[in-house]
Amino acid sequence: MYPLGASYDGAGVNFALYSQVAQKVELCLFDEHDAETRIEMTERNSYVWHNYIPGLQPGQRYGYRVYGPYDPMHGLRCNPNKLLLDPYAKAIEGNIDGDESLFSYWFKSPDDTSAMNDLDSAAHTMKSAVINPYFDWGNDQHPYISYHDSVIYEAHVRGMTNLNMDVPPDIRGTYAGLAYPSVIEYLKKLGVTAIELMPIHQFVNDSFLQEKGLSNYWGYNTIGFFAPHNAYSSSGERGEQVNEFKSMVKAYHHAGMEVILDVVYNHTAEGNHMGPTLSFKGIDNASYYRLVEGDQQHYFDTTGTGNSLLMRSPHALQLITDSLRYWVTEMHVDGFRFDLAATLARQFQEVDKLSAFFDIVEQDPIISRVKLIAEPWDLGSGGYQVGGFPSSWSEWNGRYRDTVRDFWRSQPSTLPEFASRLMGSSDLYQVNGRRPVASVNFITAHDGFTMNDLVSYNEKHNEANGEGNRDGESNNRSWNCGVEGPTNIPDVNDLRQRQMRNMFATLLFSQGIPMICGGDEVARTQQGNNNAYCQDNEISWTNWHLDKGRKELLAFVSKLIHLRLDHPVLHRRRFFTGREPGDDSNMIPQVEWFDHTGSIMDMDDWQNTHAFSMMIYLNGSDIPEVDWYGNRMVDNDFILIFNAHYEPIMFTLPDERYGRKWQLVVDTHNPNEPALSYEAGFMITAQSRSFLMLMSDKKPKKPMGL
């Protein structure tokens, strides 16, 4: 009876489907001419319908027809006229075309729930495919890169390589293209340690987008939680996409990099009561979806997509955890970023970090060992949960994004929170014993402006989406540096380049886990579109024809990443401890905060609403951590200088207690200048809107007694 799904054993295939409401289930097999053979599933145990069919081979296409009650008013939507995808399908062929047969109601009378649409959907929907599970992994192993040593690169399978002339044309925009040696070599040289792929679970192309000549580019519309998206395969749709994906993961592991998946377990592509019947709705609607109490025709929606999975249902929970285990054990992925993860915590009405889902994940010996990253919000009441996830999770830190953007556009009263975000957001995470790596720091991501657009546009420009520029976030916390969009004014372009360097330096020298939005390192633009979910074209794809300025930005970002990874004080495992208020002793703390005069900042400095500058000392000799060999870590000391003012500021370096000699290693105003040396108490100019980093010239050595 188990496992669920279609399991090939070399001699045949076992099919198993869960449905509590089904009265009869037919397995539908399709030949090369799409002729359908129906086989009634005669075996049933504990609501699992199963049959073993000898002689079937990988590549066999199939689906299900489920007979049972059709009573939408009570949440029952069985309709045997609809060919249904296997929820556990490991491969899926085709797409949907928006035909009326995909829906369980008639277009002419959508409100008449008693009139069941009896059109057959088989010719208009996707089909599940049997796969061969055997694959030569060789000696492949998970890299298991420590959280604090991680630098994440968010990427899109198609967007990463579609315009990459180094990749052969026939594999651009595919898993094979992403695994092409020059692509992996580029990421290794950049210095990132993990690629986080936007959704690659099989998703649906919405008909309303297709009618406008657009498509679901981002992929947050999952219908197959076990199947890699077929459109990203260069080798076929009947299982070939599985091997192509595995080969990609194997190539990244060989290069010492991790593969993290952006997963969407909070809803499915079947939408609300007006959506199509593709799988779960027709199999056992009430076991998978959260329905409105007292009005079970409608779906409870905290995701903005029309439905939400029922997180107190053991069968929905089993589906999700089985999927997660499959992607770790069979596909060898190294972690997950959970879209709208607050929905997964809604066992009942409210978000609850003690919900069954988190209990299951915490104790699971497979899932709990990989990286778990939450997008810690959804659209429901109380859905903003930054800092509220269990201790073993990391979170996208939305407050980090907002604060860094505000600081570099000189918004009042941002300095205190900016300082907290730089140090790992202990105010959000330390209270429940978490560490800096609980914070995934980012300034841009797929959703919103790119880094280049963040410094080039004050307003969104989403006209290409066909929604009258009404979609997308209006409050972007962006600043166009004086001109909206592209310009030939040298001073404006110079400032934009400097602002991008400022934000990259902030991101890569903050405690926590940095995440870079793919293409930002080469100043990718979406022409001001901050909601390019439907733009599978040059608006979203990365343009790899790099001019001098884009090449220089790439080199700068790579330099910063390697500098971060080479110095443990820049990515500590524990939060800093600083000087207590009123402490005027000569003890040198782990971190010290100075104003531009070289004086330790006091309460008046922090409360100055128009303060946009500071100097930070990081003590590399006081790192309470050990390396892999049990030796206490030591590092150089660093000084970080931030100036978000519109004019230059002269900073006096700290006295010699903090270090005698310093070398300038990063200057966002003059990124190509040779390194200069400074002594304690010397003055150094931070140009307007710029960042400086100085490193002590002392050689790190073990503390006495070790």
Regions found by a protein language model. Name each.
Residues 1-153, 158, 487, 492-497, ...:
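Carbohydrate-interacting/catalytic domains
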Residues 17, 64, 155, 197, ...:
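Conserved, mostly hydrophobic/aromatic
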Residues 21, 43-45, 55-57, 68, ...:
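Short, flexible loop/turn elements at secondary-structure junctions
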Residues 68-137, 206-221, 275-300, 415, ...:
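Core domains of carbohydrate- and sulfate-ester-processing enzymes
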Residues 71-75, 161-163, 203-207, 267-270, ...:
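Short catalytic/ligand-binding loop motif for oxyanion handling, primarily in non-cytosolic enzymes
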Residues 121, 156-333, 340-363, 383, ...:
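Substrate-binding/active-site clefts of carbohydrate-active enzymes
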Residues 151-153, 195, 259-261, 336, ...:
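Hydrophobic faces of well-ordered beta-strands that scaffold small-molecule active sites
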Residues 353-518, 523, 531-535, 568-575, ...:
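Conserved alpha/beta catalytic core and glycan-binding cleft of carbohydrate-active enzymes
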